[in-house]
Amino acid sequence: VRSGMTILIFVGLAVLIVLLGAITYVRYGQPLAEDDFAARANDACIAMRGSGSGVDLTRAPTRGALERARNARLEALSEIRALDQPERGAEPVARFLSAFGETNASILRLESAIGSGGKVAPARRSLLRDVRDERELAAEASIPACGGLAIG
């Protein structure tokens, strides 16, 4: 009877240890994945910022400068998408990526307006609004370095 009780206690302790380990992993393991994603995405965007392909929207940009900025953004976007995105916190990242696409579309509209002699001022204002929204969503997704990438 005594050895049966000892075995039962050891089995109970083993189950308790496994449960505590699982709870600890779920509670603390996932944020590490989120932090790793955010750190790697921020690093990719910081590297792009250092490439000098930014556009200053306080002045009238050239089509070439906009194209270089768009290409740098697309390169950063492909690096971000190649990262393993955590399941938790995926919604803010998805909203940021959507805003990133909207900003890229605004860059194209501004390029077209410059090339066709169209209405540049409204296209520039639209781009500035999209960049502001993108920066807010990047901060919410814990990747602030990616907000407004290549657009000053």
What are these language model-derived features?
Residues 12, 27-30, 98, 102:
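Intrinsically disordered, low-complexity regions enriched in small/polar residues
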Residues 34-152:
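Alpha-helical segments in soluble extracytoplasmic regions
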Residues 1-7:
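Short, low-complexity patches enriched in S/T/P/G
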Residues 7-23:
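Hydrophobic membrane-insertion alpha-helices, especially the h-region
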Residues 19-36:
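Transmembrane signal-anchor/signal-peptide helices with a preference for the extracytoplasmic
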